[in-house]
Amino acid sequence: MSFFRYLSDISSETRTLLLAYGVLGGLYLILVPLALYWWMNRRWYIMGKIERLFVYGLVFLFFPGLILLSPFLNMRLKGQGET
């Protein structure tokens, strides 16, 4: 039995539910952590106290996605020019 034949046997409600889970999982594990990486890399040295606290909360919330993306992204901050 092929995969597409199996999908056609599933009810439309179940397919909709699987699609919703896939979209939410992609948002949680890929899209929001990428945006968070971008935001932290862009604003690290100019963040205020409240913004930094908010970002740390988001890091805690989206930690699984950040760990998933960490081997592929370089988050080294720019230092003082030391080599």
UniProtKB/Swiss-Prot annotation:
Q: What class of enzyme is it?
A: translocase
Instruction: Give the main localization category.
Output: plastid
Instruction: Report which reactions are catalysed by this protein.
Output: a plastoquinone + NADH + (n+1) H(+)(in) = a plastoquinol + NAD(+) + n H(+)(out); a plastoquinone + NADPH + (n+1) H(+)(in) = a plastoquinol + NADP(+) + n H(+)(out)
Gene Ontology terms: cellular component: organellar chromatophore thylakoid membrane; plastid
Tell me which EC number(s) this protein carries: 7.1.1.-
What InterPro entries is this protein classified in? NADH-quinone_OxRdatse_su_L
**Which compartments does it reside in?**
Plastid, Organellar chromatophore thylakoid membrane
Q: Name one GO molecular function term.
A: oxidoreductase activity, acting on NAD(P)H, quinone or similar compound as acceptor
- How does this protein lie in the membrane? Multi-pass membrane protein
Classification via Pfam families = NdhL
What does the UniProt keyword field contain?
A: Membrane, NAD, NADP, Organellar chromatophore, Plastid, Plastoquinone, Quinone, Thylakoid, Translocase, Transmembrane, Transmembrane helix
| Transmembrane portions of the chain | 17-37, 53-73
Q: What does this protein do?
A: NDH-1 shuttles electrons from an unknown electron donor, via FMN and iron-sulfur (Fe-S) centers, to quinones in the respiratory and/or the photosynthetic chain. The immediate electron acceptor for the enzyme in this species is believed to be plastoquinone. Couples the redox reaction to proton translocation, and thus conserves the redox energy in a proton gradient.
Subunit:
NDH-1 can be composed of about 15 different subunits; different subcomplexes with different compositions have been identified which probably have different functions.
Family statement drawn from the similarity comment of this UniProt entry: Belongs to the complex I NdhL subunit family.
Q: Which PANTHER family match?
A: NAD(P)H-QUINONE OXIDOREDUCTASE SUBUNIT L, CHLOROPLASTIC (PTHR36727:SF2)
Protein known as: NAD(P)H-quinone oxidoreductase subunit L, organellar chromatophore
